[in-house]
C-alpha cells in the first residue's frame, strides 16, 4: 500500500502548468470531506504513473464486481498494513478486509458524495480520498 501511495504522490503531472487545486492529487482528506471536481479533473487529464505496481503475490488482492460506482481505501485504526476497501454498487454498500479477505455488504439508498469518471485505474486515483465515509461506517457498523 505504501508503494502505491508513494507512486501516486510522486507521479508527474505531465503537461500541467497551472496552480494545483486544493486539495492537490495525492493528499489525504479527513473523513467526510468532499473532493472537488477540479482535483479529479487534474487526476484524469494529467496524472502519469511511471511504474506499474503489482502485489508481491502477483495476484489481485481483491476482485470487485463490475459496475462499481465509487470506492475508498482506509487503513484500519491502530493496525499497520491492514486495509479496508469500501465501494458502492447500485443500492448496496460493501467493505472488503485485506487481512481476513472477507467482504461485507448492506442494502442502502446509496448516495454518492463525489463521482469520478476516469480512464485511469480508479484504485490508484482514489487512494486516501475519504468521501462519505462516516455514513458508510455507520451503515456497516465498523
UniProtKB/Swiss-Prot annotation:
Residue intervals of the Sema domain: 1-142
Domain of life of the organism encoding this protein: Viruses
- Matches recorded under Gene3D superfamilies: YVTN repeat-like/Quinoprotein amine dehydrogenase
Question: What protein family is recorded?
Answer: Belongs to the semaphorin family.
Q: What else is known?
A: The WR equivalent of the semaphorin-like protein is split into two ORFs which are likely to be truncated and non-functional. This ORF is the C-terminal one.
What protein name does the entry list? Semaphorin-like protein VACWR164
User: What organism is listed for this UniProt entry?
Assistant: Vaccinia virus (strain Western Reserve)
